[in-house]
Amino acid sequence: MAKSTPLRREHGQTMVEFALTLPVLLMLVLGIAQLGVAFNHYIQLTDATRAGARFGAPLDCSGTCDRTDKVVSKVRASAANLDSAQVNVSVTSTWQPGTDLRVCASYPYAINLIGLVVSSGSLNSCTTERVD
């Protein structure tokens, strides 16, 4: 009769440990990836508000054009990778030279892990420029 060695008794231990830790590691990696996507959306939203403020500050709209609508359109166009229907833009200004133009935008986000919403809310960004 062959004597059993300690290595033979622990043959499947590594596989069991791997099977137990793999789901936790996968959720951690997927969570980091989802956080990266949310951060990317925030950067795009910030760049879009900055582009809208820089577009609207020197905008000379003598006559019939609506500056607010033009700035809102510029912000939505600048947020190319975001769903423009969900980008909520507000523009605040008196449009007098030397006053501030404030462009704010918000965009909803949700961090999902395996179909479960872990965190949700809205990303917000505001940019202020001086009207020329």
Label the model's feature ranges.
Residues S106-D132:
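Low-complexity, S/T/G/P-rich flexible repeat/linker segments used as non-globular hinges
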Residues L25-M27, W95, V117:
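Generic marker of residues within folded, mature protein domains
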Residues L22, F39, I43, L59, ...:
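Solvent-exposed, flexible loop/coil residues
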